[in-house]
């Protein structure tokens, strides 16, 4: 799909994100692009017999266009301040995506309440935490740029309270630090929420190296890394010759909080292997 065809500069090619009967398009704040996209879909409907429901088609303005006026009102599109894609609420202000965590935290606490008074061993409760509770958060971790320390402690407390029955456990076998160690190290394998969150976000390192160089988000991440390292000619292959410590040291210069934290944790990721 190509946008900005109504402008004099070269058009921009964008791939559509489609799943079943849902389709997401990302395009610039430009009336010509919106009309061009609508025209493509209308032409497709004449061939396939599938018609877009424009009354249910939502448009979210992001970035600098968040407060700009709506475009092409005659198309009947629904302009919104928030929309939901695959269970995640997206807003024009990235900071508001933290609301997704609050919603999932409520679901986690609901699971704990359902199992709280079951006659489970400590090992059984740990299994509930890992299989039913934390699995609610794995997708959210990929969306929320950064979780603050207060919320991490809140979730950790909820996990600990559930496992140890909110202090009603007659005997605590080991302290919390030891309990978080893996069983082979003498612990119980109780999840450390901070490390759990960092580990899931660390998966983006793998995605970064595997994604095509033409991928927009990779180009942006690479641009910020070049600036932080003061290496304007840096290539992807050059990263293997730069120590994780050096990258982590310069990560503080990256403006994007998501990538700043990931690159800052790079040495920890490598040491874990």
Give the residues covered by each predicted segment.
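Conserved pre-motif C helix in the palm subdomain of viral-like polymerases
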Residues: 1-4, 33, 133
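Short, conserved micro-motifs composed of acidic
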Residues: 7, 52-83, 97
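Catalytic palm subdomain of template-directed nucleic-acid polymerases
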Residues: 14-46, 63-65, 92-96
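Short amphipathic alpha-helical coiled-coil/interface segments
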Residues: 41, 152-163
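Basic, alpha-helical interaction scaffolds
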Residues: 74-147, 164-170, 200-215
């Amino acid at each position: 799909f190509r946008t900005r065809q109504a402008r004099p500069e070269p058009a921009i090619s964008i791939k559509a994100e489609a799943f079943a009967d849902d389709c997401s398009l990302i395009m610039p704040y430009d009336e010509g692009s919106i009309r061009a996209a609508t025209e493509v879909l209308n032409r497709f409907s004449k061939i396939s017999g599938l018609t877009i429901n424009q009354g249910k088609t939502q448009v979210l303005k992001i970035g600098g266009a968040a407060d700009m006026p709506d475009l092409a009102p005659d198309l009947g599109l629904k302009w919104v301040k928030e929309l939901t894609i695959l269970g995640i609420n997206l807003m024009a202000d990235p900071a508001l995506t933290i609301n997704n965590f609050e919603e999932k935290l409520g679901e986690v606490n609901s699971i704990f309440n359902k199992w709280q008074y079951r006659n489970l061993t400590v090992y059984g409760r740990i299994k509930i935490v890992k299989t039913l509770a934390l699995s609610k958060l794995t997708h959210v971790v990929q969306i929320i740029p950064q979780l603050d320390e207060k919320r991490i402690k809140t979730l950790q407390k909820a996990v600990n309270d559930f496992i140890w029955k909110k202090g009603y456990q007659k005997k605590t076998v080991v302290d919390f630090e030891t309990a978080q160690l893996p069983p082979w190290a003498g612990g119980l394998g109780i999840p450390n929420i901070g490390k759990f969150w960092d580990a899931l976000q660390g998966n983006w390192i793998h995605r970064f190296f595997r994604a095509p160089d033409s991928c927009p988000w990779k180009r942006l991440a690479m641009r910020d890394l070049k600036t932080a390292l003061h290496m304007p000619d840096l290539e992807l292959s050059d990263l293997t010759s730069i120590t994780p410590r050096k990258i982590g040291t310069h990560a503080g210069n990256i403006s994007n909080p998501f990538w700043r934290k990931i690159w800052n944790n790079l040495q920890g990721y490598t040491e874990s292997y």
